[in-house]
Curated annotation (Swiss-Prot):
Induction: Induced during meiosis by the transcription factor mei4. Protein levels rapidly increase during meiosis and then decline. Interacts with spo2. Residues 16-104 form a coiled coil. Residues 1-31 are annotated as: Disordered. This is Sporulation-specific protein 13. Residues 12-23 have a biased composition (Low complexity). GO terms for biological process: ascospore formation; ascospore-type prospore membrane formation; ascospore-type prospore-specific spindle pole body remodeling; protein localization to meiotic spindle pole body. GO terms for cellular component: cytoplasm; meiotic spindle pole body. Residues 1-11 have a biased composition (Polar residues). One of its GO terms (molecular function) is guanyl-nucleotide exchange factor activity. Keywords: Coiled coil, Cytoplasm, Cytoskeleton, Meiosis, Sporulation.
Length: 138
């Protein structure tokens, strides 16, 4: 038969083995959890890296689009200003030409009136001469 001390040692030994098995199981579970966590963290880091890269690409495209829009706006306003300046020049040229033609027309109207007056005077003079000649022949 076994003594109490031997029985205690046996229970102690069994208890130590159970604790050892529990610890091994806990350690194995912890390793699996750590591996799963490491994989999840690695996956999240990769996903974050892709998203950061995509955001940087999109920010670059946005900046490029804004620059193009600014360049187009500057170009559009420059072209519009040039068109307005050209229209003003054309209008000024047309005003000068209109003033010249009006002055020329005024001069021609004056000459026409002078000619009309001369013709009337000539007609009246012919009538007078005609009466005068007729009076002399009768």
């Amino acid at each position: 038969m076994m003594s109490n001390s031997q029985i205690s040692k046996l229970f102690s030994s069994i208890s130590n083995k159970e604790n050892s098995n529990e610890n091994a199981l806990k350690e194995s579970t912890n390793k699996q959890l750590n591996n799963a966590n490491t994989l999840a963290i690695t996956h999240l880091k990769e996903q974050l890296s892709r998203e950061v890269q995509r955001r940087e690409e999109l920010e670059g495209l946005l900046e490029q689009s804004q620059k193009e829009m600014e360049d187009l706006s500057v170009s559009l306003f420059t072209e519009a200003n040039e068109m307005v300046a050209k229209a003003r020049q054309d209008t000024e040229v047309l005003k000068r030409e209109l003033d010249y033609l009006r002055a020329k027309e005024k001069g021609r109207i004056g000459k026409l009136r002078s000619i009309q007056t001369a013709v009337r005077t000539s007609i009246e003079a012919r009538k007078l001469l005609s009466y005068s000649n007729e009076s002399n022949y009768h």
